Amino acid sequence: MLSSLKNPRQAAAQLLNFGLILSTAFMMWKGLSVITDSPSPIVVVLSGSMEPAFQRGDLLFLWNRNLLRETDVGEVVVYNVKDKDIPIVHRIVRKFGAGASAKLLTKGDNNAADDTELYARGQDYLERQDIIGSVVAYIPFVGYVTILLSEHPWLKTVMLGIMGLVVVLQRE
């Protein structure tokens, strides 16, 4: 099995093949980002705050509407809080004003209180530019793999090792 590594040309071809797979995945992600006008067009629900609408591990597909279009009450959006890395999936429950200057208040369907405590210090409401995108579709539980990989880092190492071995040992 490892005899294929003795030929440097074949080993280089395998390495290039692996790089091609990674770069293709990256280009597909960036292309999807451009099409959806969202820096993160696919997100995973990380908590139970949106139950029963979305469960932990659901994979959400986002579409970021044009900033000039209205964002409506009842719409499920994903937003980033300043200085925090994890996007939040919650529903818009109140809207003050109209257009790009509208102020938005969000809340998780399974939460008792609104999100004002989650917003950045001194921020009482979200603005349209805080929204990463609106949820347009989802696939139940597919994103649970991501949750497992973040909760158990050793799984990530095992998966990467297996993928690397498959690429190296594959014969063409």
From Swiss-Prot:
Compartments (UniProt record)? Endoplasmic reticulum membrane
- The residue ranges crossing the membrane are 15-35
What GO molecular function annotations does the UniProt record carry, in alphabetical order?
A: serine-type endopeptidase activity
Give the EC number(s) listed in the UniProt record: 3.4.21.89
Q: Which reaction does it catalyse?
A: Cleavage of hydrophobic, N-terminal signal or leader sequences from secreted and periplasmic proteins
Ordered alphabetically, the record's keywords are:
Endoplasmic reticulum, Hydrolase, Membrane, Protease, Signal-anchor, Transmembrane, Transmembrane helix
Taxonomic superkingdom: Eukaryota
All ranges on the Lumenal side of the membrane: 36-172
Q: Where is the active site?
A: S49, H90, D115
According to its record, what is known about the domains? The C-terminal short (CTS) helix is essential for catalytic activity. It may be accommodated as a transmembrane helix in the thinned membrane environment of the complex, similarly to the signal peptide in the complex substrates.
Task: Share what the entry says about its subunit structure, partners included.
Answer: Component of the signal peptidase complex (SPC) composed of a catalytic subunit SEC11 and three accessory subunits SPC1, SPC2 and SPC3. The complex induces a local thinning of the ER membrane which is used to measure the length of the signal peptide (SP) h-region of protein substrates. This ensures the selectivity of the complex towards h-regions shorter than 18-20 amino acids. SPC associates with the translocon complex.
Q: What is this protein called?
A: Signal peptidase complex catalytic subunit SEC11
